Amino acid sequence: TIGHGAIIHARVIGPEASIGMGAVLSLCSEIGAGSIVAESALVPQGKIIPPETLVAGVPAKPLRELTDKDRTDWRETKDWYVRMAAQCLDPDNYHPVK
């Protein structure tokens, strides 16, 4: 998933990776599968983030490897966003502002 306001110039974003709101992925950076880039993080040009890693900061630095709890929590959050998007697209759910 990619949070709103993120700027993406990365060469690769691996499957199941999550990019936080306002994060910047500079030219030729690579984000490994399942990694999490924190909100407002700056991944420098050419930086390679290993799979299953949490990174944060300016410049982004690895904080730790992801835990099973991280993976479960992020999966649930992503699923929630998918449900909310589907709900917004449902014409029966449309309520015009009066």
Give the positions of each predicted feature.
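C-terminal segments of enzyme domains that contribute to small-molecule binding surfaces
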Residues: T1-I2, A6-I7, V24, E52-K98
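Structural signal for interior beta-strand "rungs" in well-ordered beta-sheet cores
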Residues: T1-V55, P59-P62
